[in-house]
């Protein structure tokens, strides 16, 4: 007899995408001197760029028919719409309206991605967004 019959198994599914974007860390609430002190070289008036990596993790029940939490093709399309189209090869501060009034820190990039994905994914599916600004600078956001 199959021990899994009748069990409702749950799993987490993650997918990685990479995008390139530029930005400048600058808060209009701070003076030029304060911005330079807080953000250092990242406050360069001409901005700077990153090759971001984003890992999106969803969770849910494993469908007993398909064996999947979600079809990876669907997740890929959601991530294309929520991450790649609005952010890839963009100046975050100039090309993405969200960042007109929000400092484009990696924390806020993670929040932006979370909010975009929440609008597309089934309710309750999104578990976490992990954004690598560099290999050493990483933000994890779980909607909290």
UniProtKB/Swiss-Prot annotation:
Phosphorylation of Ser-18 is required for maximal enzyme activity. The modification Phosphoserine is found at residues 18, 27. Binds 1 zinc ion per subunit. Gene3D superfamilies: 6-pyruvoyl tetrahydropterin synthase/QueD (3.30.479.10). Its cofactor is Zn(2+). It comes from the Eukaryota. It catalyses: 7,8-dihydroneopterin 3'-triphosphate = 6-pyruvoyl-5,6,7,8-tetrahydropterin + triphosphate + H(+). The active site is at 42 (proton acceptor), 89 (charge relay system), 133 (charge relay system). Pathway: Cofactor biosynthesis; tetrahydrobiopterin biosynthesis; tetrahydrobiopterin from 7,8-dihydroneopterin triphosphate: step 1/3. PANTHER family: 6-PYRUVOYL TETRAHYDROBIOPTERIN SYNTHASE, PYRUVOYL TETRAHYDROBIOPTERIN SYNTHASE. PROSITE patterns: PTPS_1 (PS00987), PTPS_2 (PS00988). The modification Phosphotyrosine is found at residue 127. This is 6-pyruvoyl tetrahydrobiopterin synthase. Its EC number is 4.2.3.12. GO terms for cellular component: mitochondrion. Homohexamer formed of two homotrimers in a head to head fashion. The gene is Pts. Involved in the biosynthesis of tetrahydrobiopterin, an essential cofactor of aromatic amino acid hydroxylases. Catalyzes the transformation of 7,8-dihydroneopterin triphosphate into 6-pyruvoyl tetrahydropterin. It holds the Pfam family PTPS.
């Amino acid at each position: 007899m199959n021990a899994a019959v009748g069990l409702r198994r749950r799993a987490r599914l993650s997918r990685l995408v990479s995008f390139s974007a530029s930005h400048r860390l600058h808060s209009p609430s701070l003076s030029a001197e304060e911005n330079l002190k807080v953000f250092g070289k990242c406050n360069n008036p001409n901005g700077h760029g990153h090759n971001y990596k984003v890992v999106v993790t969803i969770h849910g029940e494993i469908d007993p028919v398909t064996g999947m939490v979600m079809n990876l093709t669907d997740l890929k399309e959601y991530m294309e719409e929520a991450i790649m189209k609005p952010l890839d090869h963009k100046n975050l501060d100039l090309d993405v309206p969200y960042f007109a009034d929000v400092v484009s820190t990696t924390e806020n990039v993670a929040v932006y991605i979370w909010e975009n994905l929440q609008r597309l994914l089934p309710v309750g599916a999104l578990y976490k967004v992990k954004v690598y600004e560099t290999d050493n600078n990483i933000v994890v956001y779980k909607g909290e």
